[in-house]
Curated annotation (Swiss-Prot):
Cofactors that this protein relies on: Mn(2+)
Binding site for substrate: 78-79, 121, 159, 163, 166, 194
Topology relative to the membrane: Peripheral membrane protein
InterPro entries according to UniProt: Calcineurin-like_PHP_ApaH (IPR004843), LpxH-like (IPR043461), Metallo-depent_PP-like (IPR029052), UDP-diacylglucosamine_Hdrlase (IPR010138)
Encoding gene, per UniProt annotation: lpxH
Superkingdom, natural source: Bacteria
Pathway participation: Glycolipid biosynthesis; lipid IV(A) biosynthesis; lipid IV(A) from (3R)-3-hydroxytetradecanoyl-[acyl-carrier-protein] and UDP-N-acetyl-alpha-D-glucosamine: step 4/6
Name of this protein: UDP-2,3-diacylglucosamine hydrolase
Keyword Membrane: yes
Gene Ontology CC annotation, any one: cytoplasm
Catalysed conversion reaction: UDP-2-N,3-O-bis[(3R)-3-hydroxytetradecanoyl]-alpha-D-glucosamine + H2O = 2-N,3-O-bis[(3R)-3-hydroxytetradecanoyl]-alpha-D-glucosaminyl 1-phosphate + UMP + 2 H(+)
Keyword field: Cell inner membrane, Cell membrane, Hydrolase, Lipid A biosynthesis, Lipid biosynthesis, Lipid metabolism, Manganese, Membrane, Metal-binding
Recorded family membership: Belongs to the LpxH family.
């Protein structure tokens, strides 16, 4: 048996090919899985459970079917932080805290989306702090659907423009932030996404940091079992 980790699918109505590949993955790759963890940014943008698009509602039905066979866990990302209990319930997903520790076959591991580790991106971290406030989230939820969609589109556009101007270092995790989280959680193994730079990092202090990749051009899946770990790319044509 094995536990699977994915993230950064960025599903949208503009890229239904990714949704189709993910659906095939759910149909074909979970037979021997103990659990599925989705580490954020399942969707490209999420402005509220009351504005879920048809493709997202269909996906919820598929995930609900999966959840009847194995647990499906979800951690919010920077794109879908407004995904709420209503959609999670419809999809059979259990929402986890943004930093969660779990025992993976005897190994204490911390999992998260990963955006909180990119501390050199000061502008984004200010936005992240603001959006985490309960009052800010409540006020946003009170806006009309049209206004929320407009704000989300603006943030998405600004994010793409801003990211093109940021350096590689700023867009990646900051080593001190990684070390601090290891110390805080008393773990030596970490799994996250967000940076879209899949890799297994063996750190000098004996810790291990694994990054799952995005699903823009191919799938990225981390499989963890008692025998070890396997971070693999999954070409979309292999899911047919």
């Amino acid at each position: 048996m094995r536990t699977l980790f994915i993230g950064d699918l960025h599903l949208s109505a503009d890229r239904l090919d990714i949704t189709q590949a993910f659906t095939r993955f759910l149909d074909t790759e979970l037979d021997d899985a103990d659990a599925l963890y989705i580490l954020g940014d399942l969707f490209e943008v999420w402005v509220g459970d009351d504005i879920a698009l048809p493709f997202a509602l269909e996906l919820a039905e598929k995930l609900k079917q999966v959840s009847q066979k194995l647990p499906v866990y979800f951690i919010h990302g920077n794109r879908d932080f407004m995904l709420g209990k209503q959609y999670a319930r419809a999809a059979g997903m259990q929402i986890l805290p943004e930093v969660t520790c779990l025992n993976l076959y005897g190994i204490e591991t911390v999992i998260l989306h990963g955006d909180s580790l990119c501390t050199l991106d000061k502008a984004y971290q200010r936005f992240r702090k603001l959006r985490s406030l309960s009052l800010a989230r409540w006020l946003y939820g009170c806006l009309s659907k049209k206004t929320r969609q407009g704000i989300a589109d603006k943030i998405r556009s600004n994010s793409k423009s801003s990211n093109q101007q940021k350096s590689y270092t700023i867009m990646d995790v900051e080593p001190n932030a990684v070390d601090a989280l290891f110390a805080k959680t008393h773990t030596k193994h970490m799994i996250h996404g967000h940076t879209h730079r899949p890799a297994i990092h063996q750190l000098a202090n004996g810790c291990q940091r694994i990054v799952v990749g995005d699903w823009y051009e191919q799938g990225s899946v981390l499989s963890v079992s008692a025998e070890g770990i396997n971070l693999q790319s999954l070409p979309f044509e292999q899911t047919t």
